[in-house]
Amino acid sequence: MNQLEALKQFTVVVADSGDIDSIRQFSPQDATTNPSLILKAATLPQYQPLFDDAIAYANLQGGSPETRLINASDRLAVNIGAEVLKSIPGRISTEVDARLSFDRGMCVAKARKLIGMYQEKDIPRSRILIKLAATWEGIRAAEELEKEGINCNLTLLFSFAQARACAEAGVFLISPFVGRIYDWYQEKQPTSDYQAESDPGVISVRDIYDYYKRHRYQTVIMGASFRKVEQILALAGCDRLTISPALLEQLKNSSDPVERQLTPSTEAFHPPSPLSEAEFRWEHHQDAMAVDKLAEGIRLFAADQQKLEALLAAKL
């Protein structure tokens, strides 16, 4: 048994890719996309028909150049998501434009629109996760969407305050970013050679996992943004892990043993009172890494969204 097969005994494996060929190769349960992955996929020749369809769809809908661009971008994300769903049994995560991260109402409206576009393709909402940045506004939007039966994946999660607020809002799933946390500490302390057990990103997910299980929160924890296989193996037993094709390949090519590292607590505690907005902002801002990385993540996703729109605008 290879490490990928062994890991699947403890953890739901998710492909962090929009590349259908890669996804088919590793048989994941689910897949996640983001603006960076959609941008990458949009330039692949096999996706040209999906790109062309997005342009045709936007032109058919009409409206101002800005409206057509937004519709083309949304349609392309849904086209790629729908294509990926043909190769997996579970769900696809499709991301709301990062530029809406501080506007609760716009996040809700965009999520409903994306779900509607999937439904036009006869894909039920039960196969979609709407990805939202784990800002206070994004978490509140997710709380509202969950009540409508639209499940959400709260991404760019770096602080314990974000994780706690997501659980208290009853969101379906969170994506704590292991690798980006690791990157920040490596940059600040370049001489540190973090082993898996002392890796700040790994420790962050373990702490969230223990807290959720002790308080019996139903929110799924999906570790994300891995830099190396050791980080993945250190989180064997986490509810889900979303892994890039390159690291899935490494796991598939190794037969070293995989041991479960995370197990749910048998103890149960009453959850504390939910964080207020002021408490959330204070707690989150006590973590310099989380403040830096959330802001950077939103900027990077927004920049890739703009690059994608430039590709689309050239064809509209």
From Swiss-Prot:
Which residues does the entry assign to the active site, renumbered to this chain?
Answer: 131
Q: Which intervals of the chain form a coiled coil?
A: none
Name the GO cellular-component terms.
cytosol
Q: Which domain of life is it from?
A: Bacteria
What Enzyme Commission number does this protein have? 2.2.1.2
Q: Does the keyword Transferase apply?
A: yes
Cellular compartment(s): Cytoplasm
Which pathway does it serve? Carbohydrate degradation; pentose phosphate pathway; D-glyceraldehyde 3-phosphate and beta-D-fructose 6-phosphate from D-ribose 5-phosphate and D-xylulose 5-phosphate (non-oxidative stage): step 2/3
Q: Which InterPro entries match?
A: Aldolase_TIM, TAL/FSA, Transaldolase_1, Transaldolase_AS
- Root EC class: transferase
Q: Which GO terms describe its biological process?
A: carbohydrate metabolic process; pentose-phosphate shunt
Predominantly, its location class is cytoplasm
Keywords of the record: Cytoplasm, Pentose shunt, Schiff base, Transferase
Gene Ontology MF term list: transaldolase activity
Q: According to its UniProt record, which reaction does this protein catalyse?
A: D-sedoheptulose 7-phosphate + D-glyceraldehyde 3-phosphate = D-erythrose 4-phosphate + beta-D-fructose 6-phosphate
Q: Give the matching Pfam families.
A: TAL_FSA
Statement: the UniProt record of this protein carries the keyword Transferase: yes
User: What protein family is recorded?
Assistant: Belongs to the transaldolase family. Type 1 subfamily.
**Assembly and binders:** Homodimer.
Q: Give the protein's function.
A: Transaldolase is important for the balance of metabolites in the pentose-phosphate pathway.
> What is this protein identified as?
Transaldolase 1
Q: Give the source species.
A: Pectobacterium atrosepticum (strain SCRI 1043 / ATCC BAA-672)
Lineage of origin: Bacteria, Pseudomonadati, Pseudomonadota, Gammaproteobacteria, Enterobacterales
